[in-house]
């Protein structure tokens, strides 16, 4: 097919006008049309969230194919494999549709070929392209095409450790061993070993892997900061900072004296304020840096007098307290800044003094890193196994050094397209440059969504082009896609309100102006005031809520707040759970979130990437089993195996065995003691009774068989033998969350199999690999099991990128930013290279023996401080972008959830805004998202912000206030029995029919340790024949029951189940105020308070309730309310007589009267029945349990038991 020319600028403008004047319901924007059809130059599309960038890419590709370009002539890079597959699917549909629409035979044939070639097109991640490239051209570097990827983190760590120790030994024994020893000690820390150095080496290596040429960067940039260090310039900068700080302090104190000080006349602190003003006043234009430093020292010294209270306003007058507090707060802020500057003077002096020593240390580090990088590179070549970054490095090496290969790709690719360009790193950017001919790049992204700095992505790659193309269109075309087709106007307005005031070039790396603001474009979503974004704060005032570390088993106020809103959405507005997303910046609080959702029965689906696989109990048991098989002399692992469910040794048995020491041995490990016990070769052999001896023999025989089996079989076979021999796989399947536990065990076998297929063999090496992963505080990804279909989504903000949800809750707004990077011993920068903390040994000059002669001082190098400042700004910018991504996931409504003391938050004061932005110090001193949001709320109170904040206290978060999840079963109707007891009897009967005698005998043992309810105990232990008369769906008609031939009811009228009526009746009986005279009117008012639907309330017969209180029992209750206990929970330890296993019974007693020597127990039943004896038989066992619990609790034997039957038109009270 002959190439069709691309559109000129004039033709594009006409197309834009025609689109604007068309009658289409969903029109392309002018910018979208420009992005689709512009050609002949490099193009950067800055596409805000929800602006249709994927649509634009697909349309652009389709247009190029329709003009005769081959799909093989396009290089299209996506950020994920999923995105690549989605783009291919979209292109397949568009190409197919185009083929059907066109009458041009040549075009049909051409597009048909493109459709056939689509699976082989260069559409995918950069990693997938480089793998294919190296497979084809790797021979140029002597790399075999059958190389494999080191995707397994544990295998990679194993190789790294081996290489590290080889290089370490070479340097430790080499010619420069003294300087290397100094390097080693510098990072030794408390461990005083090589682990500190190893940690920093791996950190630097990961950084190097993101550069286009690691060895070149090490050579050219690693020491750059030391080479260009300018201490004179740093001192001048510091002097300017001191000047500004002293002027700020002077302004603050003068304002205080002129305005507020008269309220505190003759206060002692005012004299010191004047002293400081005199000190600062002594400075003039001629003052040098020494003079400023001297004044700073005097000022700080004055502030520290009187135990630091020399400048404190200690007024106790109630009416002046706010004024005094405001002064003291600002004074603390000012002097904190002065204290930091005073410290910086000292640090700068030490930095200059030890600069030469630190530089020497850095050179030693550079040498070690160079050797490590090369040795690790060679080792991976020997294994023919590479990391993804290695593949990219070799691809770049081939493209740079073999012009014929580079030129063939540059000629082949008509266009080099890249999605998510803001998350590109330098190695990827270099590759894109080499594949392009210099003017055929199409880059799509949004710098506001660059959130992968931890993967070495550099948003400045995007930003540099954005600025350059904006200033000089000849360099390239900049196109802005600002219209948002995803979210409601309420979501977009709130997002704009936040980032207009938060993000600029200084803090945020871009100025959030009209080029970046979101524009509402989804006309299908009409404005709705109910969808105004909400900033919800759990008020911690006077709640006494414990710190997070103490609340692992407690539902946090924050989560109860969220659950209340979720239930409101679900039950009042009919929102499906799957329409709700909970976003977190990290998974550190996920356990609390999952616990809270589980407590309220809310289904949840996680992102499936919790890296806690090795922490799961069933995997830990198996790992200890493998450790014992490898080496039974490991006491901890051996005890863990013996105590595990596979063998079940208890503490008493282990204690008896641990005393079996041979007489002639001083110390023996546990395994040797087990051998002694078997041989009866100990003076304490009398402790080994027959049952224990048999149990020990079985254990030792099985362990010996496993150890023998391990010598001749694969790890995979060994693991499955263990599962099968001890039924462990089946056992964990019966535990709570059984399918997930079995999936973990299955994955362990698969991971062992993969390990042995990767040229690593044997149990010892597998255990060593696992231990190294744990030692490095890493873990393996947890196994994902099938999630529920309708469930709330819980995921990190990173995982949510590219997704959208109608309702979004951003949780943990109060969670502090992670600043671990800035606390490291090493901080790297592309511009400055290595920043390091140098450990200097200093003479103290002490003469006395009890004083140390030398001390160690940690001195951050000048480059370290510069890199630290750079890192802080980059980190805050990334956190802002993370919040932007989170807020723009919402389609309809956005909730921002945090917590804090209302009193403290509302008393906070902030500096005035500048140019419509929060003060830069306010932004840089924020510890979390909440600090930013709250500051905006306070500073811009006069602005009509498009989000509101609301404090929610404990009184609004009680169980009653939150409510319960309403659950309904289609099998239940009003004719069925009280479902608290009988809703699973059918399943129980079917299960019992198939149960074997052994399982029946040991039923409690199988279930235990567990907690049972009375109805569960009844189901498990009462004879099946005693349940005669209970109607069970699908089990046939009960005797005397008439068969109905009525047509089924397909009406939409709300169905009311027996379970709902039963629950509502119990709640009503609990709520009735027995201190007042009971009337129909008072019962009606009480019924309104019951948490249920009106349809259920209408089914409750209040006359029948009133009639109960006319019975003998009812009158006794009314006359003895001071002896009455209602809805009382209990728990009781029971023993199963057949298996002799203990278990716990828990339940709730409807009510009882407690007298001195007698208890009257009663229980309400709403079951339908023919004869009272039916219910008496049915619930006899349950009441017997209640009776036993009360008898044990109060030591009273005389207990009367009554059933109050409400299932007929007339109430009946039956004594049991």
UniProtKB/Swiss-Prot annotation:
The name under which this protein is listed is ATP-dependent helicase/nuclease subunit A
Sorted alphabetically, which InterPro entries does this protein's record hold? AddA, DNA_helicase_UvrD-like_C, DNA_helicase_UvrD/REP, P-loop_NTPase, PDDEXK-like_dom_sf, PDDEXK_AddAB-type, Restrct_endonuc-II-like, UvrD-like_ATP-bd
Cofactor(s) the protein requires to work: Mg(2+)
Described function: The heterodimer acts as both an ATP-dependent DNA helicase and an ATP-dependent, dual-direction single-stranded exonuclease. Recognizes the chi site generating a DNA molecule suitable for the initiation of homologous recombination. The AddA nuclease domain is required for chi fragment generation; this subunit has the helicase and 3' -> 5' nuclease activities.
PANTHER family in the record: ATP-DEPENDENT HELICASE_NUCLEASE SUBUNIT A, UVRD / RECB / PCRA DNA HELICASE FAMILY MEMBER
Q: Which residues form the UvrD-like helicase C-terminal domain?
A: 515-802
Q: Which molecular-function annotation in GO is an example for this chain?
A: ATP binding
Subunit field text: Heterodimer of AddA and AddB/RexB.
An example Gene Ontology biological process: double-strand break repair via homologous recombination
Cite the UvrD-like helicase ATP-binding domain residue spans from the record: 26-488
- Which family does the similarity line name? Belongs to the helicase family. AddA subfamily.
């Amino acid at each position: 097919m002959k190439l069709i020319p691309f559109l000129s600028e004039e033709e594009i403008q006409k197309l834009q006008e025609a689109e604007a004047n068309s009658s289409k319901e969903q029109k392309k924007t002018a910018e979208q049309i420009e992005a689709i059809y512009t050609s002949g130059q490099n193009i950067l599309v800055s596409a805000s969230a929800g602006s249709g960038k994927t649509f634009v890419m697909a349309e652009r590709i389709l247009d190029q194919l329709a003009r005769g370009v081959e799909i093989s002539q396009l290089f299209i890079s996506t950020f994920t494999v999923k995105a690549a597959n989605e783009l291919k699917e979209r292109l397949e549909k568009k190409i197919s549709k185009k083929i059907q629409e066109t009458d041009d035979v040549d075009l049909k044939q051409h597009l048909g070929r493109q459709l056939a070639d689509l699976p082989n097109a260069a559409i995918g991640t950069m990693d997938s392209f480089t793998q294919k490239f190296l497979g084809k051209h790797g021979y140029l570097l002597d790399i075999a095409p059958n190389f494999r990827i080191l995707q397994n983190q544990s295998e990679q760590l194993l190789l790294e450790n081996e290489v590290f120790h080889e290089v370490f030994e070479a340097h430790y024994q080499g010619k420069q061993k003294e300087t290397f020893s100094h390097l080693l000690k510098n990072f030794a820390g408390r461990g005083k070993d090589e682990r500190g150095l190893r940690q920093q080496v791996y950190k630097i290596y990961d950084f190097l892997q993101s550069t286009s040429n690691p060895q070149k960067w090490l050579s050219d940039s690693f020491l750059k900061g030391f080479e260009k260090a300018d201490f004179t310039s740093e001192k001048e900068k510091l002097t300017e900072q001191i000047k500004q700080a002293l002027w700020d302090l002077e302004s603050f104190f003068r304002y205080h004296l002129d305005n507020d000080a008269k309220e505190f006349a003759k206060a002692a602190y005012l004299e010191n304020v004047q002293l400081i003003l005199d000190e600062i006043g002594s400075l003039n234009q001629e003052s040098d840096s020494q003079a400023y430093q001297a004044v700073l020292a005097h000022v700080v010294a004055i502030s520290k007098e009187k135990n630091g209270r020399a400048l404190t306003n200690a007024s106790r007058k109630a009416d002046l307290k706010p004024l005094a507090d405001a002064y003291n707060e600002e004074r603390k802020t000012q002097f904190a800044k002065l204290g930091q500057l005073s410290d910086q003077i000292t640090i700068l002096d030490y930095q200059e003094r030890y600069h030469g020593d630190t530089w020497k240390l850095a050179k030693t580090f550079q040498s070690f890193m160079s050797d490590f990088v090369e040795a690790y590179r060679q080792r991976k070549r020997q294994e023919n196994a590479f990391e993804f970054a290695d593949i990219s490095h070799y691809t770049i090496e081939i493209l740079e050094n073999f012009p014929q290969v580079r030129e063939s790709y540059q000629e082949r690719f008509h266009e080099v397209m890249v999605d998510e360009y803001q998350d590109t790193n330098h190695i990827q950017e270099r590759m894109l440059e080499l594949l392009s001919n210099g003017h055929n790049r199409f880059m799509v992204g949004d710098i506001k969504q660059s959130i992968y700095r931890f993967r070495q992505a550099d948003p400045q790659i995007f930003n540099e082009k954005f600025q350059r193309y904006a200033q000089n269109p000849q360099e390239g075309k900049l196109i802005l896609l600002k219209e948002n087709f995803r979210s409601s106007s309420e979501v977009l307005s709130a997002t704009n309100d936040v980032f207009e005031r938060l993000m600029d070039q200084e803090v945020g790396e871009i100025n959030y102006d009209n080029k970046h603001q979101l524009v509402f474009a989804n006309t299908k979503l009409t404005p709705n005031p109910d969808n105004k974004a909400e900033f919800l704060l759990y008020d911690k005032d006077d709640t006494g809520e414990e710190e997070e570390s103490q609340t692992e088993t407690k539902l946090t106020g924050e989560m109860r707040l969220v659950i209340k809103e979720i239930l409101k959405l679900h039950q009042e507005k009919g929102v499906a759970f799957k329409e709700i997303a909970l976003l977190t910046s990290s998974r550190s609080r996920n356990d609390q979130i999952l616990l809270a959702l589980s407590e309220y029965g809310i289904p949840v689906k996680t992102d499936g990437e919790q890296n806690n696989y090795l922490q799961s109990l069933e995997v830990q048991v198996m790992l200890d089993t493998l450790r014992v098989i490898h080496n039974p002399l490991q006491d901890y692992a051996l005890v863990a195996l013996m105590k595990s469910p596979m063998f079940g040794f208890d503490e008493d048995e282990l204690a008896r065995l641990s005393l079996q020491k041979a007489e002639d041995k001083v110390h023996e490990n546990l395994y040797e003691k087990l051998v002694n016990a078997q041989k009866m070769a100990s003076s304490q052999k009398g402790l080994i009774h027959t049952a224990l001896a048999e149990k020990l023999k079985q254990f030792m025989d099985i362990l010996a068989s496993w150890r023998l089996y391990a010598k001749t079989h694969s790890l995979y076979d060994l693991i499955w033998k263990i599962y099968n021999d001890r039924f462990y796989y089946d056992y964990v399947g019966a535990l709570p969350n059984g399918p997930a536990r079995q999936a973990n065990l299955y994955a362990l076998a698969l991971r062992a199999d993969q390990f042995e297929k990767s040229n690593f063999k044997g149990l010892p090496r597998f255990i060593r690999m696992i231990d190294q992963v744990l030692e490095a505080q890493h873990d393996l990804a947890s196994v994902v099991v099938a999630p529920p279909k309708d469930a709330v989504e819980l995921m990190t903000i990173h995982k949510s990128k590219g997704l959208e949800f109608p309702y979004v809750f951003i949780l943990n707004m109060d969670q502090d930013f992670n600043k671990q990077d800035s606390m490291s011993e090493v901080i790297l920068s592309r511009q400055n290279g290595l920043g390091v903390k140098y450990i200097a040994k200093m003479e103290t000059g002490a003469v006395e023996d009890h004083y140390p002669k030398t001390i160690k001082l940690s001195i951050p190098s000048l480059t370290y401080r510069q890199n630290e400042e750079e890192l802080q700004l980059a980190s805050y910018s990334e956190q802002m972008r993370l919040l932007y991504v989170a807020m723009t996931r919402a389609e309809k409504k956005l909730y921002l959830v945090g917590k804090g003391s209302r009193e403290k938050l509302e008393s906070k004061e902030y500096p005035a805004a500048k140019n419509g932005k929060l003060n830069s110090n306010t932004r840089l001193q924020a510890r979390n998202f909440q600090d930013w949001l709250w500051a905006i709320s306070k500073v811009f109170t006069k602005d009509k912000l498009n989000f509101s904040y609301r404090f929610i206290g404990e009184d609004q978060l009680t169980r009653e206030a939150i409510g319960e999840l309403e659950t309904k079963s289609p099998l239940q109707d009003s004719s069925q029995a009280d479902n608290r007891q009988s809703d699973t009897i059918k399943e129980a009967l079917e299960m019992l029919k198939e149960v074997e005698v052994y399982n029946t005998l040991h039923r409690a043992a199988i279930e235990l340790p567990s907690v049972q309810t009375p109805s569960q105990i009844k189901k498990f232990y009462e004879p099946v024949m005693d349940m005669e008369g209970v109607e069970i769906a699908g089990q046939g008609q009960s005797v005397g029951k008439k068969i109905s031939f009525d047509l089924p009811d397909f009406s939409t009228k709300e169905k009311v189940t027996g379970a709902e009526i039963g629950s509502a009746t119990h709640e009503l009986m609990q709520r009735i105020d027995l201190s007042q005279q009971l009337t129909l009117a008072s019962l009606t008012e009480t019924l309104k308070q019951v948490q249920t639907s009106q349809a259920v309330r209408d089914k409750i017969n209040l006359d029948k309730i009133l009639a109960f209180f006319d019975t003998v029992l009812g009158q006794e209750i009314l006359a003895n309310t001071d002896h009455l206990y209602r809805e009382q929970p209990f728990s009781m330890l029971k023993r199963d007589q057949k298996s002799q296993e203990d278990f716990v019974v828990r339940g709730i007693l409807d009510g009882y009267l407690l007298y001195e020597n007698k208890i009257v127990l009663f229980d309400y039943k709403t079951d339908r029945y023919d004869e009272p004896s039916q219910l008496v038989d049915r619930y006899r066992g349950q009441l017997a349990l209640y009776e036993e619990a009360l008898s044990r609790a109060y030591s009273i034997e005389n207990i009367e038991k009554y059933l109050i039957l409400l299932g007929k038109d007339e109430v009946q009270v039956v004594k049991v």
